[in-house]
């Protein structure tokens, strides 16, 4: 972390990014780590993180959570969320307890792993799918309830999962951030100390501050780092009068239907309140009349029959405009994922045999 060694490039066993990121070629002396992004298309990019950015993120996290402690590593150590567990542990002078997730998230191992953390302040970081799985097991849920905080990132956590966590006594902290910001930089809608947030005229979220990466390895055009000190994300959001950020979704996930814009996240939140829907994803499909129509893929809850499209539309229209109600529905056993905790919407489009536009 002193900036004098070679920059590290953490990758999974099947990651094809190293060649694209020019491994072995010259890089700025202050770059400690190059973390590949999990974009769905195009050439892999690498967020160039300095030791200063990594430590600023870790220190700000501990300040927000109430102090350093011991961490349970339950995410891949080649993703930024797992990397930050290691950095936080290093700065705290502790050794993390590792839960092997190479073959999946085994909730049966969770209670003993939490016990191994010992006394004092104890934390972990998960994605929403891991949290949901743990909450279905009483022993795993009780183990999480014994932690001082469970950070949730990798995408928004469904409201039913957050409600279940609250009932189980699990202190969930919702995080927003990415590799380009050295991990989560906004906790429960509030920026960490030093982090700057603004929403531009087009609704796009921009982030700044000491946790920011020093640009990309293999920078795209246009470069979201082009404005000094800022990173323009692909996310749409709003900031309320209290300075709390709400992330509405990704700009490329927006559905243009009949001249109106529909963001998938509110529709997904409405669908998840239907008793027969265990999980879902919403996306746009090409439509000759509307431009795009709203489509939904659902995972049916155990013990329930698949709801009809008409029933789902009526359910959504209880809280949202009729434009947001799905016009097409598909049932799957599980949602395809990319990265950690992120639905692969492009795979869903291919699954339906349609096109985006």
Residue ranges and their predicted role:
Residues 51-59, 70-133, 173:
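AMP-binding/adenylate-forming
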Residues 191, 200-228, 260-262:
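Conserved ATP/PPi-binding loop(s) of AMP-dependent carboxylate-activating enzymes
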Residues 1-34, 43-46:
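Nucleotide 5′-phosphate-binding alpha/beta core
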Residues 37-40, 71, 86, 124, ...:
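Conserved S/T- and glycine-rich ATP-binding loop of Class I adenylate-forming
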Residues 209, 236-324:
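AMP-binding/adenylate-forming catalytic core of the ANL superfamily
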Residues 30-59, 66:
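Conserved AMP-binding A3 loop
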Residues 136-188, 198:
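Gly/Ser/Thr-rich phosphate-binding loop
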Residues 321-342:
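AMP-binding/adenylate-forming catalytic domain of the ANL superfamily
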